[in-house]
Amino acid sequence: MVKKRLKKFLAIVLVFCLAGMFYYVQKPIVLTIGIFAGSNWNVPSPKSGKIIDDAIKRFEKTHPNVQVKYVSGILKDDYSDWISKEALDGKLPDVFMVLSDDLSTYAKVGMLEPLDTYMQMDADFDQRRYFSTTLNAGNIYDHQYALPYESSPTLMFVNKTLLEENDIGIPNINWTWDDFYSICEKLTVDTDGDGEIDQFGEYGYTWQNALSSNGQALYDEKTMKSTLSNNDVYSAIEFVRKLNRLNRNQNVTSEMFDKGKVAFCPMMFSEYRTYKPYPWSVKKYSNFEWDCLPMPAGPDGYNVSQMDSLLCGISKMSSKKKMAWEFLKLLCYDETTQESLFKYSQGVSVLKNVTTSKNVTKYIQEDAPMDASYNLDFFDDMMERAITVKKIDGYDQ
């Protein structure tokens, strides 16, 4: 009798153990990600969330026991505070987007897992597929703390109509500061004879723009020392002062450029992608023809510009780092995901074989009016030479 009861008890225990094991095996693994709604580039982007949602579906299909979850509806302006609060509460997502301004802080306080070992040990990962500039955006303090997800370089927008009306040709892609100044000087005039300048050469061109195109950055990333005492930096500042003197204390505004009264204006490529194609072209800059060029080169630099990148990293406190790395690669290294940036976002892919000059032109041409044509042959070279935007210990690069 005792033996029967013992056997029955052991059988019940075995059933519960097997049930527990089955539940443990079948229990879904939840991978959390941190994202924000809308565009990183502050332009209309109603479909940008589709890129992440599609990537999640593909990941869950190849990982049947995994669920990828995120909190929706967080705005970009609130995102940094939200991530910081999640970190303080011990609930930092396994994988999360990192704004370029936040990389230094997150790396310094230990929120981000260094990725150097993952990149070196993963036989399927080849960092040469990235533009060196885009990959460098996630590198700080001699470690790779994030991978680039999406980038947007700054270009020089040019009012073609204004130049043509004044018998001035569009500069070539190798134009210089001297070319830039010469055109601005010719176009900065009083057109109606009321004694006040009402047409201008440029709006928004800063000494930081000049600094990048003169072969300098605000600080040396290797020595972590400021470069402000260098002669090239001084030349950049003096050049912008010289440009500003043309305006004779007149305050040039973005509204003036929008109305076609200004020839040149630096803008991010994301704005070019948003406002060049129809229907957004009807809503902005509709009274003149415009296009973009690389930045004018300084005497000691090249036709390069600053480039901002949206990054993505792995939480240092994550218990699922191996799986997080796989999902990170799906966002930042997978060609399908990266190509979808051209369809549903306004930035460009961080991968060389996706963001070719030919591809960039093709995607813009598809959305543009039938009679429009664009020449972006300079894009590859510009991406590879760009100066990455970073903030280290409170200083912008």
Language model feature labels by segment:
Residues 74, 100-153, 287-296:
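Hinge/lid segment of periplasmic solute-binding proteins
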Residues 140-149, 154, 178-226, 264:
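Extracytoplasmic/periplasmic solute-binding protein
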Residues 183-184, 222-251, 295:
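Glycine-centered hinge/linker elements that transmit conformational signals in sensory
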Residues 35, 67, 245, 282-353:
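Extracytoplasmic/periplasmic substrate-recognition and gating elements
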Residues 94-97, 263-268:
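Paired acidic/hydrophobic, glycine-rich loop segments that form the ligand-binding mouth/hinge
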Residues 1-109, 299, 335:
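Conserved N-terminal structural module of periplasmic/extracytoplasmic solute-binding proteins
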Residues 342-397:
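Long, aromatic- and glycine/proline-rich binding clefts that accommodate carbohydrate-like moieties
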Residues 116-130, 173, 192-195, 200, ...:
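Short, solvent-exposed loop/beta-turn-alpha elements that line the ligand-binding surface or hinge
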